[in-house]
Every structure is written in C-alpha cells, then in structure tokens.
Amino acid sequence: MTNKSNSFIENKTQLIQYFKDGIKKDTDLKIGVEHEKFLFNKTDLKRINYDQIKKIFEILKEKGWEPQLEKDKLIGLKRQNQKITTEPGFQYELSGAPFKNIHSVCSENSSHFNELKEVFKSTNITTSSIAYDPFNKLTDIPKNPKERYTIMTAEMPKGGKLSLDMMYKTAGIQINYDYTSEEDFEKKFKIGNYLAPLTIALFANSPFNENKLSGFLSYRGKVWQETNRGGIMSITFENINFEKYIDHAINYPILFLKKNGKYHTPNGQTFRDFLNGNLSFLKGEKPTLEDFENHLGTIFTEIRLKQVIEFRSLDTCNFGCICNGPSFFTGLIYGSLEETYEIIKNWKKEEVMEAYLNAPKQGLNTLLQDKKLIDWAKIFLDISKKGLDKRNELNKSGKNETIYLKHIEEIISNKKTRAEMLIEQYNKTKKLDFLINHDENFSYSGF
C-alpha cells in the first residue's frame, strides 16, 4: 500500500493513477453516508461547546470508540470503519462505514443514534434534525479548536460572503458512491450535478434563520451557493475525465497545508504552484499524495471526487428520512445509471444553473427544461424504484430498498417539502420549539 505522506508527486500521471486506484469492480460497489446533526443545550437552545462535546466523546469511549487527538485535545472518535467528528461549530457528524446496501447503512445510523440518545440522558443536550441552525446568531456559536478550522475561519470569507454561515450554521447529508471506470465516473458526476436543483428542492429542510422565516425552503442550499470554493464546477458541462478534474482541482488556492506537524496558509498560491515546486515557504518541495488528498477535501462543490464520488446537496433531516436520499440516488446511480444518464445528458448549462440558483427559494416549483421539479421528482422516483427493484437487495423480512422511499413519496403526493410543512407549523404559533427532537425515534424500520 502506498504511504501517502511519503509519496512525493513528480508528475500528473501519479494524480491520474490516484483516481484510477479508486476504480471498483461492479460486484464491489458500496454506499457510504455521512450525516450531520446540531446539538443544543436543552435549557436555552444555545449550541454546545468543546467541553460538552468532549464529555459526549468520553462517554462514547466507554462503548468501544477510540479517541482521536490533535495536540492532546480530543477532537473525534473512531470504531472500525466508522468515524465521529465535529464541524467548525460542533455540528456532530457520523461518517459511516461503506456498505453494500441501504439496509446496512440505515441499520448503522439507527444503532449509533440510539447510542447517542442514551448519552444525552446524562447530559443537558438535545438535537434538532434541521439543516440550518434556526436559533443562534453566527457570532454566538462556540468555535471548534481544530487548527484547520481556525485557518478556514480567517480564509473562507475572502471568496464567499456566506462562507462562515456554511461552516458554523449548516448540517447536511453526504452520500459516497464508487465508480467502475473513467466513463462511469463521468456519468455519475454529471447526474449528481445536473440533479443538484432537484436534490436541493426535494430534501429542503432549512427554512428558518434566527427564529424567523428566512424566505428560503433550503437556506442551507442558498448558503452553500454563496460559499468560497462552492457551487457546481464549470467542467461539469464539458466532457470530463480524471485529468480534466485534476486540472480544475489544482487551480484552486491551497486553503491550508500541514507540514512537520504545523499548519501553513499559502496566501492564495494554488496546488499547481505546489506541483511546480513554487510555494514561497517550501521552495523546491513537491507535494505528497496526502497533500493532494487534503486539498481535494477543501473543495466544497455540490459534487466532489476523491476515490469516491461525493453527493453533497442534501439538507440533513430527521431519522425517518435519513435513508431516503441514499436509497433514491442508489436506485439511480447503481440500479438505473444508463436510463438516468440518457435523460440528463443533453441538458444545457444555462438551464441547470438557473434551476440550481432558484431551487433553494422556489423548491419543487422551480422550472427545469420546461418542467417543474416536482414533475422531474416523479420521473426520477419511478426510475429509482426500478433500479432498486433490479438490485433486489433484501433485508431479513425479504423487503428490498424501495421501503426507504416513503418520505419522497409523501412529498410528491402532498406536493409539499419538509420545509413547507415546517413553515405551516411555525405559522400557527410563530414559535420554533417544535424543532427540538427530545424524543426522536431512531428505530430501524428495515427488519
């Protein structure tokens, strides 16, 4: 196995090989889900601080989780292929293990959040399954002591006016998919990007900001559109391969660089500069594969490539709908790839981008190719169901992965997103106390 921290990059061929090393066989395709949650103090709904997350981690350590440290500070946990980390404002994130089917993904989430619920019983902490902090001002949110976040807090606002809102006030769901070839990567990458407007609209769950309506159904979606290094990559609408993705990625400025245990800010110099040995503070030194991998993780676009394809446009939601997004896209990506790609492949950049920018506010009423997104939702839901039926991944009760599409079916049937239902509740009392999930049910319904 390549030691990424000691493997210096001498030419672009090594970077292309990095992505080729991510290619999987058709029989080895997995699904990985990362899910973020806000944690609040029960008494005043202020966001938790480092001492409180540390207490949670200390309790979880007793359940077999291994501590992850940075300069003697407990910053995360690991157990087998699962990781727990926190975002800049202590949003709690479970990065799940890669699994063959949605049943296993959902079971993992259920198991962990029940574990977390037990922890909450001995603390003054509760959760809210919403994608944008509805209660707190940006300036009131405690800051995570991770060094990289300190650098990002200083650097990110230079290129996007809502970058700090993204860092501290949003919570999302990310789905990771494998690819079987360069051509397969291109199709999945395009599908994810072209369907970003639909994803934002269908999973909209963030209509509030500072205890009032924000004017958006997915304010998280709006924030990510105005974030440094965010949005939809321009190369999406061209013929793409690994080399083109690399050429695009290395033109981003390096956000931070860790060398010899110390973080550096290269002040606008790009990864291409680094490849050419032209970093001002590391003159003549070349990057390692680890440096490249870290750089890829600081590109915050809707769809992103590492050695998996990351779908990143979904608002987080309550446990009942966490498995909906992964099941929906698994049906399209793994079950009905060709049919899905045939529909979107000739969509024009201008049409997609207009729908993308309108979706956070207009939701399923957004127009794309002269159809409302709710009509596209019906079309792609049917295709997803066919794909999941074709996969025929069964649980212990003999049911396939279509059982997790209920949330989407209800949205389409009612012609209302979760955000619109939350707005209706808010309009009855002009209060947001219903958003707190003191007794959220984390039962796994797939058995």
Model-derived segments and their meaning:
Residues 1-161, 169, 204, 321, ...:
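Terminal catalytic/cofactor-binding subdomain
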Residues 96, 177-179, 313:
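Short glycine-centered, acidic/aromatic-flanked micro-motifs in structured strand/loop junctions
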Residues 270-352:
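Long, well-ordered mid-to-C-terminal structural blocks that present hydrophobic/aromatic surfaces
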Residues 104, 180, 184, 314-322:
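Conserved phosphate-binding loops in nucleotide/dinucleotide-binding enzymes
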Residues 121, 127-128, 132-304:
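Loop-rich catalytic cores of soluble enzymes, especially ATP-dependent carboxylate-amine ligases
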Residues 223, 228-252, 352-415:
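C-terminal, helix-dominated tail/subdomain
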Residues 38, 174-176, 310-312:
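Structured core elements
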